[in-house]
């Protein structure tokens, strides 16, 4: 009997605007079959007969692009058969400017206990430049409303190294973020993805991005300021006050299995990584036929070990060598000892007791270091 995952990701692909940097599975909400989508999504959720989850994460797209009644249908449908005494964290992503009093009332009356706001930047001109429709004032209004409704576990996403962004603008953003008095932040450098407005502009030479040295300086400044303000840098892009780490995201970095529900969602169940149909009408038909998945990949032990390292090294706490050996029945030193010693010598990794982890410099070079753990 295989152990069932205790986490699920639920994808709501609708947006009220399409941001210039985003390549996630999403569509503009107008004229979309939203109610039918929610029915099919809940049908897919029921198919897995999920009764116990530790973490549930509703992302997008923009879940709060749904109307208050639609949000209620979604939240009630997802939690109806769940044992809520086991559910530690139910996060919903929200857009500043989308969260009116009715939607907050729905969240308050549901099992949601964590809200993640896509702030991106506090600069109104920059918000317009990156295709966001909210304003700085909406951020403060939404956070005040959420706090008034009793939500204390609030997170924001910020992006740095944006087009034409200066160090002073980053400093101002960080100061404003700290001033919100919330316990969690995710900070990402702008990554150019294919099929986005920004990638098309860059290819035409029309996207003035900060140089790599300035981006590194921004990253170092962000870490130093947030640590000074009492945040722990617990994962490459994530900072939290003690006890407010994102349990759902820690589950990903611990390389645990999870259900992926909804159009374009990815999941990892019984050693199989899968992806669902992305286009909404394809997804609806696939659910009706009894299988929402479009791709499935069985991971070999080699691939599982590589993923254990790639994901685990994103965390400040790194990877436990004993847990690795217990999970895979292989000697960590035989597989990775030489590589780790080389990276320690280069100042990119350190060994602390049973754990191997990245240094600050290693964290900045993240993927370059992780690539060393691909097994030949």
What is the predicted function of each stretch?
Residues 344-354:
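A short, conserved structural fragment
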Residues 3-5, 26-48, 52-330:
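C-terminal scaffold of the Radical SAM
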Residues 13-26:
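Local cysteine-cluster metal-coordination motifs and their immediate loop/turn environment
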Residues 355-359:
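Minor-groove-contacting beta-hairpin "wing" of winged helix-turn-helix DNA-binding domains
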Residues 10:
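Conserved N-terminal Rossmann-fold NAD(P)-binding element of oxidoreductases
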Residues 329-344:
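Short amphipathic alpha-helical interaction segments
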Residues 361-376:
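Short, amphipathic alpha-helical interaction segments positioned at domain boundaries
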């Amino acid at each position: 009997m295989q152990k069932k995952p205790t986490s699920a990701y639920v994808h709501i692909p609708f947006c009220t605007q399409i941001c210039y940097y985003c390549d996630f599975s999403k569509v503009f909400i107008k004229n979309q079959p939203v109610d039918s989508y929610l029915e099919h999504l809940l049908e897919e959720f029921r198919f897995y007969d999920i009764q116990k989850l530790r973490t549930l994460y509703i992302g997008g797209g923009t879940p709060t692009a749904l109307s208050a009644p639609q949000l209620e249908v979604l939240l009630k449908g997802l939690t109806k058969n769940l044992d809520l005494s086991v559910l530690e964290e139910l996060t919903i992503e929200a857009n500043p400017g989308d969260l009116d009093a009715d939607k907050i009332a729905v969240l308050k009356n549901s099992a949601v206990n964590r809200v993640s706001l896509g702030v991106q930047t506090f600069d109104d001109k920059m918000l317009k430049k990156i295709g966001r429709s909210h304003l700085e004032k909406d951020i403060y209004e939404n956070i005040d409303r959420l706090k008034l409704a009793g939500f204390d576990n609030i997170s924001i996403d910020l992006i740095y190294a944006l087009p034409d962004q200066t160090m002073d603008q980053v400093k101002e953003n960080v100061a404003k973020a700290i001033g919100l008095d919330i316990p969690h932040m995710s900070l990402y450098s702008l990554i150019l993805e294919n099929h986005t407005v920004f990638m098309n502009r860059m290819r035409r030479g029309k996207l003035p991005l900060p140089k790599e040295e300035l981006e590194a300086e921004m990253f170092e400044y962000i870490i130093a300021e947030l640590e000074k303000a009492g945040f722990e840098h617990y994962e490459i892009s994530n900072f939290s006050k003690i006890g407010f780490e994102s349990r759902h995201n820690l589950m990903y970095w611990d390389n645990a299995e999870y259900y992926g529900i909804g159009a374009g969602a990815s999941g990892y169940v019984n050693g199989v990584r899968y992806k669902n149909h992305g286009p909404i009408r394809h997804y609806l038909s696939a659910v009706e036929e009894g299988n929402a998945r479009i791709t499935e990949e069985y991971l070999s032990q080699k691939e599982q070990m590589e993923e254990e390292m790639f994901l685990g090294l994103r965390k400040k706490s790194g990877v436990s060598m004993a847990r690795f050996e217990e999970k895979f029945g292989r000697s960590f030193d035989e597989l990775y000892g030489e590589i780790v010693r080389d990276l320690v010598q280069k100042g990119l990794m350190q060994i602390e007791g049973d754990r191997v982890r990245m240094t600050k410099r290693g964290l900045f070079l993240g993927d370059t270091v992780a690539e060393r753990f691909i097994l030949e």
